[in-house]
Amino acid sequence: MVHFTAEEKAAVTSLWSKMNVEETGGEALGRLLVVYPWTQRFFDSFGNLSSPSAILGNPKVKAHGKKVLTSFGDAIKNMDNLKITFAKLSELHCDKLHVDPENFKLLGNVMVIILATHFGKEFTPEVQAAWQKLVSAVAIALAHKYH
């Protein structure tokens, strides 16, 4: 289990409270699909993913990105209990969707990049360290059910 200090929790929740989940979620998933094109195979039902502009403008990418980031909000509310928080999602992604758990790490790294671009000077090294710790812990929690 990962332990978050009060300062780390404050750094994470401070930025989270300013985030537009719908916009940022679509941007995060879209960037993942553009930068790591092999991840697109998990989204065959999303239609046109043929170019960066098609991906970033795709309403299904935006909707699923919002869903992903909304569940990230659950992580922020339950930072001390991530494995339990993500147990069902881990099982779904492992047993039914067969998502490579490495993709969770990639998405976490994309999240950090997006936070840096959105928050600029507010995204200090200390804030980045707290977010890196969180996205890594979420990736581990999501990979928990994998054998």
From Swiss-Prot:
SUPFAM superfamilies found in the cross-reference section: Globin-like (SSF46458)
Biological processes annotated in GO: cellular oxidant detoxification; hydrogen peroxide catabolic process
GO molecular function: heme binding; hemoglobin alpha binding; metal ion binding; oxygen binding; oxygen carrier activity
Superkingdom of source: Eukaryota
CDD domains, alphabetized: Hb-beta-like
Matching InterPro entries: Globin (IPR000971), Globin-like_sf (IPR009050), Globin/Proto (IPR012292), Hemoglobin_b (IPR002337), Hemoglobin_oxygen_transport (IPR050056)
A Pfam family: Globin
Tissue specificity annotation: Red blood cells.
PTM annotation (Phosphoserine): residues: 14, 51
Any one GO CC term of the record: haptoglobin-hemoglobin complex
Keywords tagged on the record: Heme, Iron, Metal-binding, Oxygen transport, Phosphoprotein, Transport
List of residues binding heme b: 64, 93
Role this protein plays: The epsilon chain is a beta-type chain of early mammalian embryonic hemoglobin.
Family: Belongs to the globin family.
Quaternary data: Heterotetramer of two alpha chains and two epsilon chains in early embryonic hemoglobin Gower-2; two zeta chains and two epsilon chains in early embryonic hemoglobin Gower-1.
UniProt protein name: Hemoglobin subunit epsilon
